[in-house]
Amino acid sequence: MATRGANVIWFRHGLRLHDNPALLAALADKDQGIALIPVFIFDGESAGTKNVGYNRMRFLLDSLQDIDDQLQAATDGRGRLLVFEGEPAYIFRRLHEQVRLHRICIEQDCEPIWNERDESIRSLCRELNIDFVEKVSHTLWDPQLVIETNGGIPPLTYQMFLHTVQIIGLPPRPTADARLEDATFVELDPEFCRSLKLFEQLPTPEHFNVYGDNMGFLAKINWRGGETQALLLLDERLKVEQHAFERGFYLPNQALPNIHDSPKSMSAHLRFGCLSVRRFYWSVHDLFKNVQLRACVRGVQMTGGAHITGQLIWREYFYTMSVNNPNYDRMEGNDICLSIPWAKPNENLLQSWRLGQTGFPLIDGAMRQLLAEGWLHHTLRNTVATFLTRGGLWQSWEHGLQHFLKYLLDADWSVCAGNWMWVSSSAFERLLDSSLVTCPVALAKRLDPDGTYIKQYVPELMNVPKEFVHEPWRMSAEQQEQYECLIGVHYPERIIDLSMAVKRNMLAMKSLRNSLITPPPHCRPSNEEEVRQFFWLADVVV
């Protein structure tokens, strides 16, 4: 059948073929001879490429390669993902001139940082009489619908959010998989493709001047992106969930924190949209229901289960809080963030924290793991974030956010900024409270008693026995010589007196709290139990 134009499926964050309503919309006219053009555009910002480290870029490229491989496999080589470099409006205008576009279909990117990009394409579509189709599938609910249902304002507490989405109803089930076998694809003129900077094959991170950070030798896990990998990991994760449900645990990653084993988290694949959040949500809930029914047959009553996907709901909450707030990632102009007078940026302290050179082994191990792998256990994220802000260095959370956005595989703008505001007490129920500050030394002894994790990522301490590995400064000069770890030479001195810093910070928080007659509105949990469901809270404090 001769083509009568084409529909574009423009991949940005939803880097998958399953549960992709935008892809289904782009395929809806295939029986009328409308071809499909799958597109990804490196515009310097989309998919988090404005501030990106090597592991994040490699994960993105893996994900794009996986889409291309699946398209070619499903269509006997007729279909492929077209990966361009340039300005989206210009590329779509040129494509329209070449093949006449009927629709440009996208998965909604609800965060305000994408508004300008998407509005430029809406404007182009109006000008050229192209349908612009936007589908909600990166979130469980449309954040704008949540705000509308809540009376036009974002629900400031998690409990308010739960109440609002209960009014809306359960999130939609995943859509059917797209049938690509009988789809037609456009063959573009090679010279035209070159003029639009179409990659003949996917580039490497180095093409974008993105290089490794000299920590790769420490990597224990090399994460691989892509839908195929995401679905394999989902199967493994569901086995873990089932085992946990059958033992009465509903949040296995929080109930049994383990910083040593390979992580079972799906968050990186959710962040890039390699895994549908709706598929994850319903897979877990359907699994729990089946386990519950089998238990009932045996005469065992399984209660609870309301929080089995609590982390996904917190994700929705942060998206909703940010959707109408373009300043959500900073203090200035951010109405829900408390303006804590953090210390003037100290580049020496900041760089020591970024590179894992603080003199505190757990902090250093975690920060080096982040650089090497792009990953940190949830507990370690909270620990290094607290250390940077209210629990140690008294530096603004904005510095930590930018570092995480660059290196953390699963860091997205809304959720990462929300977490940083929360951990730093910039948006917290117990206003400006620093009474509980996790001690990185005590926590390390609890989570890593033999120093296995520390020695993996801080090899300077490889020969140090476990009684000193978490406090190497306690070694005598003779012991430092014996274990080949001279403090200040092989491993850095502590950059702060942590006990004094915590006391100073607590007083600063208390003083600021007393100065606020009317606390500003800020996103927050409704009670302490919600805090414990979100964080894994250590009960070891400075």
Curated annotation (Swiss-Prot):
Result of altering residue 397 to F: Abolishes formation of the FAD radical
Q: Which conditions up-regulate this protein?
A: Expression is regulated by light and circadian rhythms. Under circadian regulation, expression is influenced by the clock pacemaker genes period, timeless, Clock and cycle.
One Gene Ontology cellular component: nucleoplasm
What InterPro entries does the entry give?
A: Crypto/Photolyase_FAD-like_sf, Crypto/Photolyase_N_sf, Cryptochr/Photolyase_FAD-bd, Cryptochrome/DNA_photolyase_1, DNA_photolyase_N, Rossmann-like_a/b/a_fold
Q: Which GO terms describe its molecular function?
A: blue light photoreceptor activity; DNA binding; FAD binding; flavin adenine dinucleotide binding; photoreceptor activity
Key words of the record: Biological rhythms, Chromophore, Cytoplasm, FAD, Flavoprotein, Nucleotide-binding, Nucleus, Photoreceptor protein, Receptor, Repressor, Sensory transduction, Transcription, Transcription regulation
Q: What does the record say about domains?
A: FAD-binding region regulates cry stability, cry-tim interaction, and circadian photosensitivity. Photolyase/cryptochrome alpha/beta domain is sufficient for light detection and phototransduction.
The miscellaneous comment for this protein is:
Unstable upon light exposure. Light induces the degradation of cry, likely due to conformational change in the photoreceptor leading to targeting to the proteasome. Appears to bind 5,10-methenyltetrahydrofolate at substoichiometric levels.
The superkingdom of the source organism is Eukaryota
Instruction: Cite a single Pfam family from the UniProt record.
Output: DNA_photolyase
According to the record, how does the cofactor bind? Binds 1 FAD per subunit. The bound form of FAD in the inactive state of cry is oxidized FAD, not reduced. After activation by blue light the FAD is in an anionic radical state, which would be paramagnetic. Green light, which reduces levels of radical intermediate, has an antagonistic effect on function.
Instruction: Relate the outcome reported for changing residue 337 to A.
Output: Accelerates formation and decay of the FAD radical
* Species, as recorded: Drosophila melanogaster
Its subcellular locations are:
Cytoplasm; Cytoplasm, Perinuclear region; Nucleus
- According to the entry, every stretch annotated as the Photolyase/cryptochrome alpha/beta domain falls at 5-140
List the protein's name: Cryptochrome-1
Please give the annotated consequence of changing residue 416 to A. Accelerates decay of the FAD radical
Effect of mutating residue 420 to A? Abolishes formation of the FAD radical
Upon gene disruption, the observed phenotype is: Flies exhibit poor synchronization to light-dark cycles and show no response to brief light pulses. Mutant abolishes rhythmic tim and per expression in photoreceptor and glial cells, but not within certain pacemaker neurons of adult brain.
